[in-house]
């Protein structure tokens, strides 16, 4: 089972919160104290809470569940995308479009258009168009890929959201809440943990911390999928033996 240690978190700077004047009182139970005007997060809480979240994600992946990685802050985008791809899951790394979950029917139409344009870009259709029309379609393709590329093969709503920065991604969290989709989120000292099912109190800005979260979630998802494949292989073997 994928777990993260206290040492891993200390080395990544997970314990460094925001300046004390920006704190959200709802995060008080998870704050150890302050140093040089900066809140220090109590990792005695974070370690077990994150490991519990990892076990939950692994369990969902073991049942062929879909994990949607969400992190549109500049510091998070790259790690979100790389980690989601490393475990064959899905991501939103650029901008959360309002209604991405709650208006899935419309989003599905946009994904269909994205796939049409992708086909046209490789089957020679673009070459048959005027320069202006080809450029317009190419720009449309780039725009759609940027916003929907990470979910184009999701094939339906996700089974869990993994979010970096609860404050920054509050719209995504609200949509998940409305649909009953569980949320795992990194919540810094300046944020409210409202609507988060699995709170991970921690720094949501430092790239080392973000990479620790995303790579651990990817490892947990891969471990879960490994369990699923092992069970499947066992069942296949059993069927063959009969």
UniProtKB/Swiss-Prot annotation:
Keywords for the protein's UniProt record, in alphabetical order: Ribonucleoprotein, Ribosomal protein
GO cellular component: cytosolic small ribosomal subunit
UniProt KW Transmembrane keyword: no
Keyword Ribosomal protein: yes
GO BP annotation list: translation
GO molecular function (one): structural constituent of ribosome
Disulfide bridge positions per record: none
Highest taxon of the lineage: Bacteria
InterPro entries recorded: Ribosomal_uS2, Ribosomal_uS2_bac/mit/plastid, Ribosomal_uS2_CS, Ribosomal_uS2_flav_dom_sf
PANTHER family, A to Z: 30S RIBOSOMAL PROTEIN S2 PROKARYOTIC AND ORGANELLAR, SMALL RIBOSOMAL SUBUNIT PROTEIN US2M
HAMAP family from the UniProt entry: Ribosomal_uS2_B
Family classification: Belongs to the universal ribosomal protein uS2 family.
Entry protein name: Small ribosomal subunit protein uS2
Origin species: Shewanella frigidimarina (strain NCIMB 400)
Gene name linked to the record: rpsB
């Amino acid at each position: 089972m994928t777990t993260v240690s206290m040492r891993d978190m200390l080395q990544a700077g997970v314990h460094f919160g925001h300046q004390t004047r920006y704190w959200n009182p709802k995060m008080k139970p998870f704050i150890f104290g302050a140093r040089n005007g900066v809140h220090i997060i109590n990792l005695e809480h974070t370690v077990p809470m994150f490991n519990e979240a990892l076990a939950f994600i692994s369990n969902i992946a073991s049942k062929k569940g879909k994990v949607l990685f969400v992190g549109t802050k500049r510091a998070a985008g790259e790690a979100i995308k790389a980690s989601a791809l490393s475990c064959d899951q899905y991501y939103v790394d650029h901008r959360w479009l309002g209604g991405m979950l709650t208006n899935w029917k419309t989003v599905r139409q946009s994904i269909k258009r994205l796939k049409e344009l992708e086909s046209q870009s490789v089957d020679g259709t673009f070459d048959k168009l005027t320069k202006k029309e080809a450029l317009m379609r190419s720009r449309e393709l780039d725009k759609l890929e940027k916003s929907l590329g990470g979910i184009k093969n999701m094939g339906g709503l996700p089974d869990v959201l993994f979010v970096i920065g609860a404050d920054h991604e509050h719209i995504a969290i609200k949509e998940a809440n409305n649909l009953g989709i569980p949320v795992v989120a990194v919540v810094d000292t300046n944020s409210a943990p409202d609507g988060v099912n699995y709170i991970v109190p921690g720094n949501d800005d430092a790239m080392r911390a973000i990479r620790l979260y995303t790579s651990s979630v990817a490892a947990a998802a891969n471990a879960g999928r490994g369990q699923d494949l092992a069970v499947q292989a066992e069942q296949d073997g059993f069927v063959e033996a009969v």
